[in-house]
Regions:
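Charged interaction scaffolds used for protein-protein
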Residues: 1-6, 10, 18-21, 25-39, ...
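Short, hydrophobic/amphipathic alpha-helical patches that form generic packing surfaces
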Residues: 40-51
Length: 105
């Protein structure tokens, strides 16, 4: 999901380097250490939305708590599934590239 809808408005929501920095500032931990705890996932989604909005010059005036009040568990599950699917697709693409890279050496 490259976008998230809140109160009928669409906002960009994607992983950026800023999202990782925001997560570290919010939690004191690295985003790469996220398990499947709902609060961590929700915080990371918030960081992704806030950073993507900054990058795209889209106004995003929600605090983490305001954001959490407007997000449903289904939205969290959908976002998590989309991120997992994208990660699996990236791995598959890298595996396809690896054999051809070896042949050229």
């Amino acid at each position: 999901m490259n976008k998230i809808t809140i109160n009928g408005n669409e906002y960009p929501c994607r992983q950026t380097m800023g999202a990782f920095l925001r997560f570290k500032r919010e939690t004191g931990r690295e985003a790469t250490d996220i398990k499947q705890e709902l609060t961590d996932v929700l915080t990371f989604i918030y960081c992704c939305a806030a950073s993507a909005c900054d990058a795209d010059h889209v106004e995003f005036n929600y605090t983490l708590i305001q954001f959490a009040d407007l997000i449903t568990p289904d939205m969290v599950n959908e976002w998590t599934a989309q991120m997992q699917a994208e990660a699996e697709a990236n791995v598959a693409n890298e595996q396809k590239k690896s054999p051809s890279a070896l042949k050229n050496n």
